[in-house]
Amino acid sequence: MAMLFVLPSCAQNNKPMAKIYDYKALNNKGVEVDFSQYEGKVLLIVNTASKCGFTPQYDGLEALYQKYKDKGLVVIGFPCDQFAHQEPGSDEEIAEFCRLNHGVTFPLMAKTDVNGANESPVFTYLKAAAPTEEYKGFKAKATRTMLKGISKSVEKDSDILWNFTKFLISKDGSTVKRFAPVAEPASFEKDIEAML
């Protein structure tokens, strides 16, 4: 018996022809979200955690959302428990934590795997579109090496190393930039402004 597998064609630059708008994911209330509703918006997609050293970045993400949401920015948080079990709560507990401690009003999705056999197709796409983040300077490069050493879910070079990896997607979905967990949200505000 022969089996036929059809794979999506790739552009000459080895990036997938698909765009973020071709994907769906469950939000934190269990409702399917069709990302096609975000076409024409700048998206900032982040894998998040409530018990991480980078958790205070929720404040910076919310500040960006409040400043630019009327200009077309949508921040979307994907809670993830793959990195040292720093997101142990239920979807409801995570949402309450984010609201009470960080004033989060941007959309939160259901707890999601971002690496491995059960990773969300959204993150499979994002990692293919932007396979590595930029680490500038010795301290940042040392952080990358350390994170890669302790991240048990990392199997491929494109895998996410830790919580608060950020993906910035242009209005037409053609450009995807990836920012390291150590990158504070305000540090790439000019990139957001350029896309709006």
Regions found by a protein language model. Give the residues of each.
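Conserved helix-turn-beta segment immediately C-terminal to the redox Cys motif
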Residues: 39-42, 50-51, 55-79, 98-102
